[in-house]
A protein has these predicted regions:
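N-terminal pre-Walker A segment at the start of P-loop NTPase domains
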Residues: 2-43
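C-terminal lobe/lid and adjacent interdomain/linker elements of RecA-like ASCE P-loop ATPase modules
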Residues: 2-7, 12, 18, 367-458
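Extended helical coiled-coil dimerization/tether regions that scaffold
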Residues: 6, 250-313, 457
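Phosphate-binding glycine-rich loops of NTP-binding sites
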Residues: 51-93, 248-249, 317, 321-330, ...
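Conserved P-loop NTP-binding catalytic core
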Residues: 68-139
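Electropositive, glycine-dotted interaction segments
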Residues: 127-267, 271
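GG-anchored amphipathic helix commonly corresponding to the ABC/SMC/Rad50 NBD signature/C-loop
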Residues: 303-305, 311-354, 364-368
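Short loop immediately C-terminal to the Walker-B catalytic DE motif
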Residues: 357-359
Length: 458
């Protein structure tokens, strides 16, 4: 079965139909929509993204697949070869070191030979949309890609030369010579190649470059955090510039750096952990042993008269909570990401993908963590896309985009449904468990708790 995407309209035709629209000033380019047209368990699904988005559903529903989709777009935005970007380039550090879950082959839906993804980025230039088709039969390549700004096509691909690994690319140019066409390598994201291929000699070309820069900036700083408590319990080497790994295995080294570099953030982290702890917690610390090359560090919870509990003895839930809180309260400076350093900090935004945020935590504890996230994401420099098994921790919290994820029993495809705020209020007299499972049961489009559940497509 061959996977194809609709053919993009000619640039000239698209340009004639566009009318200028006023766009409010946006300081940081922001991913506001993820389109999963054909990716793993998804078909034609759309995930809206707010500063704080919670995707919930049972294990196997496809929540992790949605996080993987945004991770794949982020990897492609770095401009490396597609296969190595998704299968991993090796080494210990960097966003491309390890493969995406399942590698490139695992991203392709069963029985298909292509990945089709897209996103929308709100920027100071307007709404930038990217759509990309990656074919995996024969040579792994970009089969189709388009970049638009407020509906105007700025870049689109055409015919391919499979033998030479090239794809004809046309980009907008408002000079008398018309749009520019050139064959570009099809082994990496075309949009990521534009800054090196477009001269910027005309107003139209500068518009293309600006839109591409806004999109790439928004996608590059995506960090997927899936803490592995077993890996967090070991003594680690001190690192003056420690950056947290996706597994949080080096969290003790990161805490040691944070404690000495920023007492203010350290105090905020302590308050966040104290708010979620089920017992009085006096402080956080980092134990040390050995000297010189043998010096090692271990995070410690100070429980007062109960003593000091090291990370090697702490519960899975508390270790995961510590890792999530540390990332939310410190930002990209201590994460193993490849930031767009050419862009000022004030114009960049971190997107944190939090896998199974509530694992090992009670509903109240997960709720405390979400309240921290709501406070932090309100400042515009961090956005959070988190997954939960049950929605209980997010119910009643203002400012949370709540989306249900489930499988279609007929097709097996993952479905996404946005839960309207009015539908989150539990009906009087229902049990706590029923309230937590509020949006499951009736089919799409029915009314729950007085509000409609909006179907986001298959």
């Amino acid at each position: 079965v061959t996977s194809e995407a609709p053919v993009a309209p000619p640039l000239a035709a698209a340009t004639r139909e566009v009318r200028p629209t006023s766009v409010p000033e946006v300081k940081r380019p922001t991913v506001e929509e993820l389109r999963l047209t054909s990716f793993k368990s998804y078909r034609r699904a759309v995930l809206p993204m707010s500063p704080l988005t919670v995707l919930y559903g049972p294990s196997g529903a496809g929540k992790s697949n949605a996080l993987d989709a945004l991770g794949v777009l982020s990897r492609l935005a770095h401009g490396e070869e597609i296969k190595s970007s998704l299968d991993g380039v090796g080494g210990r550090r960097g966003p491309l070191a390890a493969p995406v879950r399942g590698g490139l082959a695992g991203c392709v839906p069963h029985g298909r030979n292509a990945i089709i993804l897209g996103c929308a980025v709100r920027s100071r230039a307007g709404t930038v949309r990217l759509d990309v088709v990656v074919r995996t039969d024969e040579r792994v390549r970009i089969a189709r890609e388009s970049l638009t700004l407020d509906g105007q096509t700025l870049m689109a691909t055409g015919e391919q030369d499979l033998a030479r690994g090239r794809i004809n690319t046309t980009w907008h140019n408002d000079s008398r010579q018309g749009d520019i066409r050139a064959p570009l390598p099809n082994g990496s994201l075309i949009t990521a190649q534009l800054p090196l291929r477009v001269a910027g000699a005309s107003k139209g070309e500068r518009k293309v470059l600006d839109a591409a820069e806004q999109l790439l900036t928004a996608l590059r700083e995506v960090f997927a955090l899936h803490p592995v408590p077993a890996a967090m319990r070991g003594w680690v080497r001190p690192e003056p510039q420690a950056r947290l790994h996706a597994s949080a295995a080096n969290v003790s080294a990161v805490l040691h750096r944070l404690e000495h570099e920023c007492p203010r953030r350290w105090a905020r982290l302590l308050r966040a952990v104290q708010a979620a702890a089920p017992h009085p917690l006096l402080g956080l610390g980092v134990a040390q042993r050995g000297e010189g090359e043998r010096r090692r560090l271990l995070a410690v919870f100070d429980e007062g008269v109960l003593g000091r509990t090291g990370a090697d003895q702490a519960s899975d839930g508390m270790l995961r909570l510590l890792a999530f809180a540390a990332v939310l309260l410190t930002g990209a400076a201590v994460l193993d990401v490849d930031p767009a350093i050419e862009v000022p900090d004030a114009h960049r935004q971190l997107v944190l993908l939090a896998e199974d945020l509530g694992a090992g935590l009670a509903t109240e504890q997960a709720g405390a963590l979400l309240r921290v996230a709501r406070e932090v994401t309100g400042k515009s420099d961090i956005r959070l896309l988190a997954t939960l098994q049950e929605p209980g921790a997010a119910l009643g919290l203002d400012g949370v985009e709540l989306v249900e994820c489930r499988r279609d029993p007929a097709t097996g495809h993952s479905l996404l449904r946005r839960i309207e705020p009015v539908a989150r209020v539990p009906a009087q007299g229902t049990a706590a468990g029923e309230a937590a499972g509020l949006p499951t049961g009736p089919p799409a489009g029915t009314v729950r708790g007085g509000g409609a559940v909006v179907d986001l497509g298959e």
